[in-house]
Amino acid sequence: MANRRQEALEYHAQGRPGKIQVSPTKPFKNQRDLSLAYTPGVAEPCREIAAKPEEAYKYTVKGNLIAVVTNGTAVLGLGNIGPLASKPVMEGKGILFKAFADLDVFDLEVGSENPDDVIRFCQLLEPTVGGINLEDIRSPDCFYIEERLRETLSIPVFHDDQHGTAIITGAALLNALELVGKAIGDIQVVFCGAGAAAIATAEHYVRLGVKRERITLCDKDGVIHAGRTDLDPYKKKFAQKIDARDLPDALKGADVLVGLSVAGVVSPAMLAAMAPKPIIFALANPTPEIMPDEARKARPDAIIATGRSDFPNQVNNVLGFPFIFRGALDVRATKINEEMKMAATRALAALAREEVPDAVMRAYGLERLRFGPDYLIPKPFDPRVLLWVAPAVAWAAVGSGVAGRVIDVDEYRQELEARLGRAREVMRGFSAHLQEDPQRILFPEGDNPQIIRAARVLADEGSAVPVLLGDPEEIKRAAEDAGVTLEEIEVVNPAAAADAEGLARAYWERRQRRGVTLREARARVRDPLYHGLLLLKTDRADALVVGADMYYPDAVRPALEVIGAAPGRKHVSGIYMMVLPQDVFFFADCTMNIDPDAETLAAIASTTAEFVWRLGIEPRVAMLSFSNFGSVPQAGAAKVRNAVALLHEREPSLQVDGEMQADTAVVSSILTKTYPFAKLRGAANVLIFPGLDAANIAYKLLNRLGGAQAIGPILVGMARPVHVLQRGADVDEIVNLAVLAAVDARETKGH
């Protein structure tokens, strides 16, 4: 514990104190930028907003800015520590808003325990922010503050301590009830705790379908019953006419326990008295009302959730507030109403039933994760939550009449994808175009779980027609283990193919003078990789992707044997598409040619440029060296110069030049001012390296240290689209390469 305390203190103190900062979003490098950012240029947007207030969303950060407001009277696990001491918590909230939903935050700690002061403070903030997240304000003040602000403000206000827990446990409840086979209108629910979160959650459950008279709340004084005279108006709504007076009595025969109180107040004996297949949400933090292993021992038939990350079914409010505000602000909602909260609950419940991406399982160190008793709600670090919850909330705002603008849900989802990273945006654009003409993609490693999951993604998106090659029973078994259906995914068994003899003869005719006998050809055709390559060779498929279980050379060699280089080409090479926040670059050759001569370098540049054209991007090719346009008379630089000369002669319309240093290539001002004769019109987007060592080092450094996403390797120069994965590729990497293979195949056929 002492080590954790010191670690936490060092985390907050190291470098710049605290956890957040304000960063400019516009250039600010010279006098011109100063005159635009501030006086006199700043007067122009001011005039526009004065004439038309909604223009603030166009010219300022208002539409992406949240105020996190507290007075520090009820900080989780710490109590009333005051506004200043609560500031680290509010800064942490700001990090979560930014990391999960790309929302900016001002954390504002109000120096008053008077709820009317907090209300007035928030009212005065309305011109500044797009929404207000109330945080760590004691009950019942929090109810009064939120109600008054909802009545008086025209921006969304949301008390996360109340509604976040309600929304997320609501999703868990819906899914748990499906698993135990109980109807929501028949269940008996007991709350251990009767604070803001418990009351808001109980109200949310009523809207989901739980009968109010079947909900029992217990506070520190026992059951909230009709005979008590110490209840505030919010607790009175749940005062039941029942005989039970304490938590053990209330839990007898109950179907659901929702713990929102303190550690250790629930015993195994209490759980033993609950109904069959109980649902237990023990949500006190950091230590729950009863530890999950203890609860499981008492009730093996129970479904259990906690607020902890080290047990299944973590109920974490980060699944709610970032995405709810994202959706609300993006349609300029005037409030967050019950329809929007309900939409968030149902979106989370539905997402938990979807197949879990490999990247999510890898983030949590899991090999398998599927809907069931140990997976009721999505994991907090599942990037799909943004794509499910925010659109659901936004559309609910539109449907309930509180939105200031209407959205196209599909377009909005694509905008959200872009917030998750430039690579997702780029690949989504390719996928969308392929849906009109999906290509048939062969996967020889058909029983590989990652390949199967990737095939499922491709089939669901409609961006390709995946074909798995291998033993059908093994593929079926692997799919079942991975929790993936094979619907709309074709399975081909090379060992029982009706056309095996024809394919064998085709391969034999190609390789008979390379030592291959007809008998050997017949044997190889039963191999999924050779079978797939021959299907591709004979135009029965559009592309092939392989390598998840193979070393790169072992996958490339058969491809060269069967498919070979494209007509007129002697060399194949490997490209990586490097995706940065603002730019996309293509690096070559990263995988094939160790020390290419001038002729080979020219071929690498030519085939790379062809591929980039097929993606719909105009290539601007820089031939890289340590020298700029003959500045160093050395053999290595001369090799690159000679390659450039060959390209200028053979492809005069191609934007290519060199030799040049890397900064000359990517900084257009260096190129245009110092080397105005260069054929490149602007910074290069295709970088051809002088050798494999430089290319391989560069792409890996940019990926690991520069934060670029590397998509590839993309094999170019082949007669047909064959692409070889890095061994151990994850689902996203397989999908990305398959999409690029499909684009390559479609565009190749079109020419």
Language model: regions and residue ranges:
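N-terminal ligand-binding/catalytic initiation module
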Residues: 1-157, 351, 396-399, 403, ...
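Conserved P-loop NTPase motor core
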Residues: 134, 205, 244, 260, ...
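Anion-binding alpha/beta catalytic cores of soluble intermediary-metabolism enzymes, centered on
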Residues: 84, 136-183, 404-405, 415-751
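A structured beta-alpha segment of the ubiquitous adenosine-cofactor-binding alpha/beta core
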Residues: 116, 178, 228-273, 511-536, ...
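Glycine-rich adenosine-cofactor-binding loop
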Residues: 65-77, 82, 166-170, 180-206
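Adenosine-phosphate binding glycine-rich loop
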Residues: 160-161, 177-182, 186, 282-390, ...
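NAD(P)-binding Rossmann-fold cofactor-contacting core
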Residues: 192, 208-235
